[in-house]
Structure formats: structure tokens, C-alpha cells
Amino acid sequence: MAVTKLVLVRHGESQWNKENRFTGWYDVDLSEKGVSEAKAAGKLLKEEGYSFDFAYTSVLKRAIHTLWNVLDELDQAWLPVEKSWKLNERHYGALQGLNKAETAEKYGDEQVKQWRRGFAVTPPELTKDDERYPGHDPRYAKLSEKELPLTESLALTIDRVIPYWNETILPRMKSGERVIIAAHGNSLRALVKYLDNMSEEEILELNIPTGVPLMYEFDENFKPLKRYYLGNADEIAAKAAAVANQGKAK
């Protein structure tokens, strides 16, 4: 049976991950640790014999720079890359820039967990005159006002990620090309929920660690056979637990 593999990588730790702030569409860069995580992911993929034909990422530099570092370690800096806003992190609305633990102290752990992980729950909206509104950013100049979020739930994130998967990424994989996607915690959770047919309750508890290759294997009909991380299982579990704890009051 022919098996097709897909590699997903959540960007390495960003400066705002380090500061425990809601990031969303804010274009913050990787921390030093994040750069190291991305390089380590590339080294691990190289050790396991991976190489690629095409890469996808978002239009946010923490994902773009993660991909750069991964491909550099693979000696594939030349690889063709498509950047799409549809792979961006979920938009966190008026929470963007706020400290997660301080927000939990103000609103409670459960409310913040719902804002972070609830399927259909949206954080408080931005207003269009807010400097954080993506309509002020030239990289989104060609998007319609309807496409520009004031806030997003995971459900709304799925509404942009999955059509892009089905219409753009999957056809390339079906043509036989080997694909890597460098994206974000929630855009990748959106894809995992879809591929694994997860319930809303199951996806609530899924936390994807930064800078760790997440592997999928598909059968000849492109149905997922298995999903697993590359790397030390104990270290990965600890990183995932740390992601879960970010939204709790100190």
C-alpha cells in the first residue's frame, strides 16, 4: 500500500509566546529559543531522511522564519513556497497583545480557556478604527472587508483553512509532491480536527507544541492512517502541557 506523508510544523516560540501574550495576526518574530526550535526541527527531519517538493506557510513572519530555518537545515532553501493568509493564526480580536495569565486573573481560567480553545467561542471583537484591525495592513490590501476578521473562533478559522487545504494543498499532494506546512497553533488545530474528524470536545484538549514536526501518513485515498510527533515523547508531552497552562492565572 502506497503511503503519503505530510509534515506540519507549528512555528517556533515567538517573542509573545515567551511573554505569554495573545498574538493572533500580530506579526511578532521568533525568540532566540524559537529560532533554535526551528533549526532543531529541520535537523530532525534531515536525520529521518525527509526532503520536500513544495512548502506552504502563512503571511506572518514567525511561521515564515520557522520555515526558512527548517529548509536551511535541510539544504532546501531554494524550495518553492506559497504564503497564504488562510494559514494565519486564529485572530484573537481585542485580546491581541494582552498577557494570558493576567487576562485569566481578570476573567477566570475557564473563560480564557473558552476564548483560547472553545470551538465556536469568539474573543471580544476589535473595532475597525483599532490599529490592530488587519484592514490597516498592506499585506491584506487585496482581501474584501468580509474576509478581514474582527475576531475569530476555531470554527471560523476552519472555514478558511479547510477550503485552502482541499483546493490548493491536497491536489498538490495527490500529484505526488512531498509537502511541508509551517503554520500556527490554531490553523494547525483546525486542520487536525478536520483530518481526524475530531469532536468539539476532543479539539478543546489538543495543544500543539512549538517547533515540533507533526507527521501524518495517508493511504492511497488520502485518508489519514496515523498522526505522530517526531522527537522525544516526554519532552514533547511537557511542551504540550506548557501550552495548555499558558491561559491559567498564576
Swiss-Prot record:
Is Endoplasmic reticulum found in the keyword set? Answer: no
One GO MF annotation is:
phosphoglycerate mutase activity
This enzyme's EC code(s) = 5.4.2.11
Catalytic activity of the protein: (2R)-2-phosphoglycerate = (2R)-3-phosphoglycerate
The answer to whether keyword GTP-binding applies is no
Q: Which cysteines bridge via disulfide bonds?
A: none
Q: Name one Pfam family in it.
A: His_Phos_1
Q: Which domain of life is it from?
A: Bacteria
Instruction: Give the enzyme's main class according to its UniProt record, as a single word.
Output: isomerase
Site features described as Transition state stabilizer, chain residue numbers: 184
Query: What positions does UniProt annotate as the active site of this protein?
Result: 11, 89
Q: Could you provide one GO biological process annotation from this protein's UniProt record?
A: gluconeogenesis
What keywords does the record list, in alphabetical order?
Gluconeogenesis, Glycolysis, Isomerase
The record lists the membrane-crossing segments as: none
| Chain residues that bind substrate | 10-17, 23-24, 62, 89-92, 100, 116-117, 185-186
Q: In which pathway does it act?
A: Carbohydrate degradation; glycolysis; pyruvate from D-glyceraldehyde 3-phosphate: step 3/5
PROSITE patterns named among the record's database cross-references:
PG_MUTASE
PANTHER family for the chain: PHOSPHOGLYCERATE MUTASE
Subunit info here reads: Homodimer.
What family does this chain come from, according to its entry? Belongs to the phosphoglycerate mutase family. BPG-dependent PGAM subfamily.
Function noted in UniProt: Catalyzes the interconversion of 2-phosphoglycerate and 3-phosphoglycerate.
Protein's name in the database:
2,3-bisphosphoglycerate-dependent phosphoglycerate mutase
Question: Which species expresses this protein natively?
Answer: Escherichia coli O139:H28 (strain E24377A / ETEC)
Supply the source organism's classification: Bacteria, Pseudomonadati, Pseudomonadota, Gammaproteobacteria, Enterobacterales
